[in-house]
Each structure stands twice: as C-alpha cells, then as structure tokens.
C-alpha cells in the first residue's frame, strides 16, 4: 500500500517560522504556504522535507502534473491555494517573469529542464551511457537519483539526440520547445538553432487564451455536456466542503484553546495527535463528518491524509495496520455541555455527511499497489534480459588480458555492457591478479572508486553458468575491496524518486564497508573481553565495553517495516576507560547496508549514571527493561539481535592457518577437508542470500533462530494458500527479516507473499543449517596444538574417508556411471572426475542395518554446495525440520536422489570461476516405490510404500544395470522411459526416513564449462 507519505512532494502552511528556504535561505514565515520535496535523510533511516517558499519551489525545477495525486497535503489546503498550486503546475512552474508562475505573457521557462555546455568530460549520457565531452551541448531533466535519493532532485544529463529520443519518457511535452529550456539564452546562436530544430514546440490550431497549457487530451475535448455538468457539480461540492472545514477551523482557533480542542477529541473517543494544526484538523473533520469509529481490523485510530483515511494502529507488535478507506465508519460528533457556553459551538449545527474526494484520488486509492511492487533503486541486472546480463553496466579493463581489446569489447557488448576508460564511471573492472598486486596508478583509481576487480574468466562464465550475477562476481573477485556491483540506474520517468525498472534480487544501496574482509578486520582489532568496541566511537584502543554481573552492556537492535520501506539498526554500548574511571555511552543508528546513519558519544559523570542512562535508552528503544528475562516485542519498537562479538574467532583462526604442514592424511583427503571447511566460501554463500554479515555473522547462526525462521515460512505458506489479509503477510515478512537480518541496501524489503519467495527462503535456510554445523565444528573441539588443523577438523567429521584407487574396478564403474548418465539437456558443462573417496559415517551402517534386507536398493546421486558437506558428513543427509513448510519441496520433506549424475550436479552450484564441486553416491533402500508424475506434497506415504519415485521422461537404460556389492547401479545411457505425461525430465527418488540411506562414495568433480560465444 502506497501511503500519502510515500509521495515525493508535500505542501502545507508553515507551522512555525523556524524553517529556512532551501533556495533563497530566507526564513519561511509561520502560516505561509510552503512546498517541500521529500528526500532520504543521510542521518537516519527515513525521509525529511526540504522546504521552500511557494515561489522558490518552482524556480529550482520541479515538474508536477497532477497536484491532487502527487502532492501530500494538497487537499488540506484552502480552496484558493489549491487552485494556485494547480494553475502554477499547469503553467509549467516558474515563468520568465514574475514569481507566481502564472499571469506572465513571457514564454515559460521550464525549471526542471536545462541546456548548457558540459563543464568537464566527467558526465555520462543517461540515454546511451556514453561520455559527454567537455564543451558539448548537453540537456538535463531534474530527477531523483535512485542510488542517492538523499540528494533530492539533481540534473540527469543527455546528449541532445538522446534527449530527443527519450522526449516522451522524460515528460518533455509536445507543446514545450527548446527555447523554454533553462540556460537556452546562454548558448551560441548556431547551437540554439540546432536545438530549435530538434525540439520544436507543437502548437494546437486555434488555441485560445485560457486553454490548458498541458497537452489537451482529445477525449477530454469531446466531453459531453452531461459529463461537464457532472464535473462542475463535483468541483462546486469540493469547494463548499473545503470552505466549510476552513470556516470551522478559523472559528475554532479564535474561540478554543489547544487544551479545549484536546478535550473535544477525548470526549469523542479520538486519539490526540501531537501538534496544534493536527489537533485542529481532527476536530474539524469530526465536526463536519462525524466522529471516527475504531478500525474494524485492529481497533486503531483512523486519520485523514490527503487521499483517504489511514489506520494508525498496529495489527501485531511487528506490523502496522494497512487499512485505508474513503468511507470510514462514524458516529455523531458530540459537543460536551460545558463547551456550550462557547457561543460559536452552541450555534454550530453541521449535518453529518460523507467526505467528498476528487476523482483522481479515488482512482489512486483503488489502484494502490501492495508494498511488494514498490519501486527502488535499480541495481545489477535490474533491467537486463537473460541474454544481456550486463545491460546498463560499464566495464573497465586494465592490464594485459588473454584476448585483445577488440575481442573483449565484442564480448562485453554481446552481453549488453559497454567499455569505459574511466574508473569512477565503471560498474566493474576486469583485470589480472598480477595487476591488482602491482597496484599502479590506474588500479589505485579503481580502488579509490571502490570498484570490484574480477578475472577475465568472468565473461565466459556469465553466459555459461546458471548462477546469479552476484554469485559470479564473488566467484571471480580478485580485489579485497569493492562495493556491491551496480548497473547504471534506469531513468526515473516521473519525478517520484522511483524507477520503473523491475527490481533485481541483488539490488543494494551504497554499502557501509569496503567489503566483508575489511570490516571484519576492524572488528577483530577492537575486541576486548566480552564485546567489540565500535570503531566509530573513536575509543576502540582506549576503552572496553562494560561487563557487570555476567552481562555485557552492548546491544544491537533491528526494526523492519516493509510498508515504510525501513530496515533500521540501532547500536548501544556502555564504554569504560581501560585505565581511568571514565565512562561513555556510544550509540549509532541508520539503515542496514548503507552509509545512511549517524552516531553520538556522550561522556557520563559516573559509572552509575552511565548504567542508568544505558538502561533508559534501551527501554526507550525496545519497551523492555535491560534486565528483563523474557523479551516482549512492542509496536514500532526495536528487537534485539544476537551478535557475534568475535570470542570464537581465535579458535577458528587456529584451525585455518597453515594447515597441512603436520597432517598424516593423504593429500587428496587434506584438500577435501580444506575445501569443505573454507570459511570464505561460507561467507560468500551467505552474501548470495543477501544476509547481512554485520548483523548475523557466521558465529551467530543458531539452530534456534533458523528453526524459528522455518516456522515463520510455514505460516507464510499457510497464509498465502488461504488468501490471508495483506496485514498478516506483512506481519510475517517483518518478523522473518528481523529474525534473519538481510541487507537490502536502499530497496524496500520484499514481501514474502507467494510460493516462489517461500521456496527461495526455504532453500536459504536449508543451506544455513549446514553452514551453522560447519562453523560450529570449526570453533569447537580439540585445542591440541600438536595436531595439524586439517587432522583436527577431519576427526570432527566422525567419518572414515579413504581415497579409491583410480585403477580399481569400483573406480571404473563410478567413472562410467558419471559418463553415461550425463543428461543431454545439461549441456553447459562436462564432468571430469578428479578424486573418488569411499566414506563410512560413524554409526550409519548400524542405523541402515534394518533396511539392508529391503528389496530394490540402488546406488544414487545426491549433489549439494561444498559449504554443506561438513554438515552432511558429520550428521548425515537430513530431512527438513518439522518447522519447515512442506510446500518448499516438490514431493514433501524427504531426502532427494537422482539416477542421472548431471541432475544432482546442478545442485553443486559451481561456476566457471569456481568449477570444483562435490557429489555423493548413496545406497538407498527404496523398496516399494509410490510413483508420481507431478508435484505432491507428501507428508505420509501410502500403506505398503517405502519411497517415492518421480517419473521422468528419460531414464538410464535398465538393461545396462550392474550390481556392486549387491546394490543396483543404473549406469546405462539415457533412453526414453515411455512416460510422456509427466512434469519431470528425469527420475527423482525420495525417502522419508534417514535410516534408509547409507552414504558410500564422495566424488570431487571438475565442471568443464562450455560457451557458445567463441
């Protein structure tokens, strides 16, 4: 739901004389008409108004076509002022002469369009994305930059030809001409003439003075007399309504004090707002239309805001109510007896009536999109098609690459990107490891601009891999620096601060830290005792976080509100000097994953004062006492996040530094252990899922949190299938994102409102469960310094891992199984077997023993990310927890296998830059199979069935099956199964009891990716 507060512009009568005009810097007198553009605050996670005098507002270049719809507060103005705003907007804003924007005979100057000579060669045309050379004529449209909304309206530059091509999208109306551009008169004569030819104004035949300046709609011209009469009546009714409300407000100001007005609201069971004008508005609304009854959904207070009545209540402690209506329920407004002494109130008799709304606002209420469709800054691949993944991106190349510049340029352009020679204009840099290490002047510019550097292989991988663009950036990254890679933002067509482009899954705002490594390094340097001192305090080397009674006085709080689009954090620390009795309270706040925010450091008189102030702030922000054992979430209040302060970092570090120097394990096993315990791979996996590593580092992944998140997804799945209210979906989404902190940058957190979003988050939690196991193993266990870190980690897996001789019969059978069952449709890569390991998990054979006698046992494939294998080997293949939604899996919650190697290999999530994957072969006791052709969310197998088989159109040739240790190995080449009415291309096998699986082999595979580009 798009609330009125989402609007880019606001108009009102100045509540005081304190605000200064952003144009002329003069104060804006109290009660005078003022207008504002709403901009993202750089200091906190929210928007603030930039106020202007009415006349100054139009001079800075704001284009408004429909004030009724585009400007918050418009309908609360006096009628005459509404007409003033409308006429000024229709006339194109500021004029060549005068200040009102109306009444001048001079040609109107368009404040939001400009022409000038480029002052440098740094600007880029937003049409063709090419550089605009210094001294060239360039044209601009003032818009909100989706990447920097806090800057408000800024010039977005175009080549004249590109501007002409995008004329309609940019809102340069047919009747506008080049001579109306701001700065046109300063151009040379020949440039003026050229622009006049390119941008002629189309004049309507026989247009009379007083006709609309706006392009007149042909349909509007032909309006019937009946329709015109209807519009005229509505206009008169709106004017009469407005006059009545303002007459009452004017009289109330004369005869009633603010306290009197508050008492009137309380007597009529209405909430009392803050601010004199808001109180007056609500009393007048009640007197004219009746006292508002509580919201039917949450019993909250309804409040009029421009285009409708909005509920200000909360459905739950996590989510505000979304009710919005133009016809709220009311009762008679009652004036208490004691107020009848006031002559005006005694005489006032208003017939209860319904509020009338202009047709534009009625339409906007009906067409209001849900939060999930709200636009946000465009980011990587946000407007790219599948065959043009680098659309809107500019690529810089540095150093000697394996291909010449023309070849690289052709590759980039074929993928939708463009070459650039300037670091500060680049989205991405392609170079070599040698160039990064050399760090010449050009590379320093790249680092200064915080541009990620990736290897040349990235270009091949983009077309060959099924991974997301962000996964590929991470797989090929060469630089320790680099913010989230962004495309050039798609143009904002209307000046609303929103992009019409589809949102990218990985869209982000400016990131706060220069990559994960740097911020983590900073935190390690400041770790003292129980918690890390925030470096922004400036006291990381001279103070520590106070710990008293086993409780660390440090808190990180989170608050997500999808309706408002906020994703806020609040940090609070009590710091004690390392040497002296000095104490400080440090707090910081802002938007997760961006530079938006601020902080404050206060020195306190004593330890007691510091503790008291800390506890007061904590209670103010959360609604809970600091020492409270059971936390209760309150509406609009923050929720505490579990944060890893780095206590276990040293334990992890010991087990990842200089591994292999003392190991007694075979080299292939050593390499395998290093691979599955690679911390950087775990972090990359979390970043791919947009998890905020600052708020939820590896060390604080907990089963409790993940299981709670599964439960929320189950509720989401139920709510979606039952068609529950928007409020319930919102509530669940807010809870999920608060529990598992995500980094969305400047875009709104997306609603979890469909099966696909549930599926994606279920997959994320499945992977997080295994990452949690791996990291828990890393930081726990033996501290024996005499052992090699690899051997220590190997022992934690409780799995016997032996290298299979390449020349053995079983190795030959397995290689044949890989070769023969590679599906023809999985042709993006070939598979090469590097190592084969025979594995025996502790206790698994014993667990499998009852199923050893079951008929129909097969050796089948199971693929997974490398980050999941520590969990798989130490705990076995597991079934999703009871909390997980059953619809997150095609055939319900079970363990899935395949008889085609490439079907399972796709789940390894490899890429050209990271081509090594791991895959399992398990003995699976299938018994009697329940055969299915389409998705079925199995919760219990039919009687007499032991497993499910999803029937595919292709199956390994059964005549080629062989037996290995009494187990069937379906290693025949793929042939038609004869089953055509199925949704599956290849077979799937699912068991619902973990004891039916006995893992036998683990294969290390190299994915040799192909490409059709060269």
Swiss-Prot record:
Consequence the record notes for mutating residue 986 to H: 14% of wild-type activity and increased branching 15-fold
Compartments (UniProt record): Chromosome; Nucleus; Nucleus, Nucleolus; Cytoplasm, Cytosol
List of residues that carry N-acetylalanine: 2
Motif (Nuclear localization signal): 207-209, 221-226
Outcome following mutation: residue 871 to L: Increased DNA-independent poly-ADP-ribosyltransferase activity
Result after altering residue 34 to A: Abolished DNA-binding
Binding-site positions, Zn(2+) 1: 21, 24, 53, 56
Residues binding Zn(2+) 2: 125, 128, 159, 162
Keyword Protein biosynthesis: no
Enzyme category, top tier: transferase
Gene Ontology biological-process entries: apoptotic process; ATP generation from poly-ADP-D-ribose; carbohydrate biosynthetic process; cellular response to amyloid-beta; cellular response to insulin stimulus; cellular response to nerve growth factor stimulus; cellular response to oxidative stress; cellular response to UV
Record site: Cleavage: 214-215
Effect recorded for residue 1003 to P: 1.5% of wild-type activity
Active-site residue list: 988 (for poly [adp-ribose] polymerase activity)
Effect of residue 589 to A: Decreased poly-ADP-ribosyltransferase activity upon binding to damaged DNA. Abolished ability to mediate DNA intrastrand transfer (named 'monkey-bar mechanism')
Quaternary structure and interacting proteins, as annotated: Homodimer; PARP-type zinc-fingers from separate PARP1 molecules form a dimer module that specifically recognizes DNA strand breaks. Heterodimer; heterodimerizes with PARP2. Interacts (via the PARP catalytic domain) with HPF1. Interacts with NMNAT1. Interacts with nucleosomes; with a preference for nucleosomes containing H2A.X. Interacts with APTX. Component of a base excision repair (BER) complex, containing at least XRCC1, PARP1, PARP2, POLB and LRIG3. Interacts with SRY. The SWAP complex consists of NPM1, NCL, PARP1 and SWAP70. Interacts with TIAM2. (Microbial infection) Interacts with human herpesvirus 8 (KSHV) protein RTA/ORF50; this interaction negatively regulates RTA/ORF50 transactivation activity.
Notes on the domains: The two PARP-type zinc-fingers (also named Zn1 and Zn2) specifically recognize DNA strand breaks: PARP-type zinc-finger 1 binds PARP-type zinc-finger 2 from a separate PARP1 molecule to form a dimeric module that specifically recognizes DNA strand breaks.
Name of this protein: Poly [ADP-ribose] polymerase 1
Organism: Homo sapiens
Organism classification: Eukaryota, Metazoa, Chordata, Craniata, Vertebrata
Gene: PARP1
